[in-house]
Curated annotation (Swiss-Prot):
This is Formate--tetrahydrofolate ligase. It is an enzyme of class 6 (ligase). The keyword Ligase applies. GO terms for molecular function: ATP binding; formate-tetrahydrofolate ligase activity. Pfam families: FTHFS.
Length: 555
């Protein structure tokens, strides 16, 4: 079979103006970025404001293997399947970060015959949104350090600056740096560090903002440091929220592209789900809900991370809950959770599937606990055997849950027709949605609910630093914000090697970081990194471009 990029390059891509017409947008309703990409201005959303929202389908997954389980692929293929059934459908996805693209994953725009196009553009610089976020983030750093240099009128304690610079690459050497060296003309020396851009609070702010004015208000609230009296210092205190919003005004507009089969797709925003909230932008999802009858969207990593955050964080800003949830499962991931070594995952092992099913079962029950109907999509791989597939189907159906074997990677929309048909029936009912916690509950209760009710743990321990931070959060009146757990994606726990569905474990919160602009409190668990490193053999080693500009090796 051809590689993803070979399939994408051989596909017949339509002018973006034709894709816009499918969802009722005229030439004047879009801003072209070349022939195959466009942005949708915010006024267009206002134009369709009275339109009834379409149905919303959330695609999530079990705890993944390092290679991922194909959530984006299933999301795209499912949208194409609905389109084949003459449904007015759109897909809403996150945009990829260059760090993982050049590092371990390669491209991140779906796979096989279920991809979004133009694949190379989306995976590289796209419309420049992530670069704008990088610039906006680092501009705040520059203004902060300038304030220190110019007499420190805000009385900022350089030892208590929490705002870091960012870069959209994996670069471990930048995690801890010293800046301001070289004498008085070069600023105030202090310790600093870099995060990957998609971990920046600016990314989360962009993805949760609903307008330019909301964006400005959120930017102003971002806490960047403490002063010598241990009081918070914000971007608003620097007085640069207007300038930063100016840098982001175009990045705030959703990006319109298409799938291989010509289904309209909005790709906008890309926060990681293990260190941020892991969902595409509220504006993109809102826009899709106004323009389509069915919207398929995804949330990063497993249902314990992106899924939980979509439901407890994003939906509160979106004003709309999913009408159904698709949990993507693969036999290779179930076998990994069943104790099989990663090198043996392509070999048949029915007993490991049975043992690893505990992971899928917990994810199903977690999503059902929100009052949502759930269907399992088995993302089929060539190594899957009939006995493994039938075992997984039987185990899932024994829970009273629908299951569908999807082959969208190999067959595109055709491979998702059964899933689309079963979902159509599920979408007729209105779910009785309920949140995991209420915003007015104490932060300690919210943490406890996520750990005990979603993860299956028994207790939350706070480090001395986290205890102090919790007191400061309460003193500053930030207790009514949702929690955003930052942890490993491979396990329900904070330990990557604790697979399947562990119980009775304790988790330790290392730090509680207030992201007041985004509107949540990040709880750092385990050793999760906000600036990844490159592997020994980065994916970039296989990438190249010919003399005539044709890209190869991008997954």
């Amino acid at each position: 079979m051809k590689t993803d990029i070979e399939i994408a390059q051989a596909a017949e891509i339509q002018p973006i103006t034709k894709i816009a017409e499918k969802i009722g947008l005229s030439f004047d309703d879009i801003e072209l970025y070349g022939k195959y990409k466009a942005k949708i201005p915010l006024e267009v959303l206002e134009k369709f404001d009275e339109q009834t929202d379409g149905k919303l389908v959330l695609v999530t997954s079990i705890n993944p293997t390092p290679a991922g389980e194909g959530k984006s692929t299933v999301t795209v293929g499912l949208a194409d399947a609905f389109a084949r059934q003459d449904k007015n459908v759109m897909v809403a996805l996150r945009e990829p970060s260059l760090g993982p693209v050049m590092g371990i994953k390669g491209g991140a725009a779906g796979g096989g015959f279920a991809q979004v196009l133009p694949m190379e553009d989306i995976n590289l610089h796209f419309t420049g949104d992530i670069h704008a976020i990088t610039t906006a983030n680092n501009a705040i750093s520059a203004f902060l350090d300038n304030s220190l240099h110019q007499g420190n009128p805000l009385n900022i304690d350089p030892r208590r600056i929490i705002w870091k610079r960012v870069l959209d690459l994996n670069d471990r050497a930048l995690r801890h740096v010293t800046i301001g060296l070289g004498g008085p003309l070069n600023g105030v020396p202090r310790e600093d560090g870099f995060d990957i851009t998609v971990a920046s609070e600016i990314m989360a702010v962009l993805c949760l903002a609903t307008s330019i004015s909301d964006l400005k208000e959120r930017l102003a609230r971002i806490v960047i440091a403490q002063n010598y009296d241990r009081k918070p210092v914000s971007v608003g205190d620097l007085g640069v929220q207007g300038a930063i919003a100016m840098l982001l005004k175009d990045a705030l507009k959703p990006n319109l592209v298409q799938t291989i089969e010509g289904t309209p797709a909005l790709i906008h925003g890309g926060p990681f789900a293990n260190i941020a909230h892991g969902c595409n932008s509220v504006l993109a999802t809102k826009t899709a809900l106004k323009l389509a009858d069915i919207v398929i969207t995804e949330a990063g990593f497993g249902a314990d991370l992106g899924g939980e955050k979509f439901l407890d964080i994003k939906t509160r800003q979106l004003g709309k809950q999913p009408d159904a949830v698709v949990v993507v499962a693969t036999l290779r991931a179930l076998k990994m959770h069943g104790g099989v070594d990663k090198k043996e995952l392509t070999s048949e092992n029915v007993e490991a599937v049975k043992k690893g099913f505990a992971n899928l079962e917990r994810h199903i029950k977690n999503m059902q606990s929100y009052g949502l109907p759930v269907i399992v999509a088995i993302n089929q791989f060539a190594s899957d055997t009939e006995s493994e597939i039938s075992t997984l189907k039987e185990l899932t159906e024994a829970l009273g849950v629908s299951v569908s074997l999807t082959q969208v990677f190999a067959k595109g929309g055709e491979g998702g027709l059964d899933l689309a048909e079963k979902l159509s029936a599920m979408l007729q009912a209105k779910p009785d949605f309920r949140y995991l916690y209420e915003l007015n509950q104490p932060l300690s209760v919210k943490l406890d609910k996520v750990v005990t009710e979603i993860y299956g743990g028994s207790k939350v321990n706070l480090s001395p630093k986290a205890k102090r931070q919790m007191r400061e959060i309460e003193e500053n009146g930030w207790n009514n914000l949702p929690v955003c757990m930052a942890k490993t994606q491979y396990s329900f726990s904070d330990q990557a090697n604790l697979l399947a569905a562990p119980e009775g474990f304790e988790v330790t919160v290392r730090e509680l970081i207030p992201k007041i602009g985004a509107g949540f409190i990040v709880a750092l668990l385990g050793d999760v990194m906000t600036m990844p490193g490159l592997p020994k053999n980065p994916a970039a080693l296989k990438m190249d471009v010919t003399d005539d500009g044709k890209i190869s090796g991008l997954f």
